[in-house]
Amino acid sequence: METLNLPAGYRLERGLLWPADDRDCAALVFDTVPDMDHALKHCRQFELAVQAGGNMGVWALSLAAKFDRVVTFEPDPKNFRALVHNTSTAKNILSLPCALGNEAGTWCDLEREAGNAGAHQVTMGDIAPIVTLDGLNLPALDLLYLDIEGFEMMAILGALETIVRFKPVIAIEDKGLSDRYGYSQGQAEKFLATHGYEVVARPHRDVVMVCR
C-alpha cells in the first residue's frame, strides 16, 4: 500500500490534514457541524457566507455545500496551511490568513492552548493581519458564523455596516471568553439586539440571531 507523505507536524483526521499536536479540537469540531443547521434554516438566500475562525476547513466545507460562495478566515499559520489543503478542491471557498476584528491595519499574535488547535488568545503582534469585514466591501452576506474564542464582539464592530446593509443570519460562540478583551458574556448578543436582532436558537454554547 502506498504511504501518503504528510507535511511535518501534521496527521490525517477523518481524511483531512490536521495538526499532529492537536488533542482536543478535532472531535469537538466534527461534533458541532450539525449545529449549523440552527442557523441555516433561517437563511433566506444562500449567496455568500462568512465563517471565522476557519480552523482546518471543516465548517467551511460544510457551508460550501449550501452557499454559492464562502469566505473563511484563519490567522493561525499552522491551521491555515491545513485549511488551504483541505479546501483546495472546493472552488467556491476563499480562505484568508487574517483575523476578523474592528481595527484594520493592525497585526496580532496568537497564544495557542497546548493540545487544542482551536483555542487561541489574540494579542498584539506580527503573526497575522487584522481586517474588518466592512473593509472587504462584500456584494452580499447571508450568514455570518463566528467562532473566534471571545473576539466575536470586535469582529461584529468591524462588520456593522455590512450587517446593517444585508441583515445576515448571525451565529456566534459565547462561552465567556470575551472577558479577555473587555466585553462581558452576552454583550455581543445585547449589542445586536439594539440593531433589530433577536435570538432564535442556542445550540450548545452558540447563539443564533436573526434581524426582524
State where each predicted segment sits:
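Short, hinge-like loop/turn segments at secondary-structure boundaries
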Residues: 88-90, 110-116, 162-163, 187-191
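Short internal loop-to-helix segment that lines adenine-nucleotide cofactor pockets
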Residues: 27-50, 116-166, 178-182
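Proline-aspartate-enriched helix->loop->beta-strand connector
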Residues: 168-172
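S-adenosyl-L-methionine
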Residues: 1-89, 177, 185-191, 199-212
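Hydrophobic pocket-lining residues within nucleotide cofactor-binding pockets
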Residues: 54, 98-102, 148, 174
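Glycine-rich adenosyl-binding loop in Rossmann-like folds that engage adenosine-containing cofactors
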Residues: 8, 12-37, 91-139
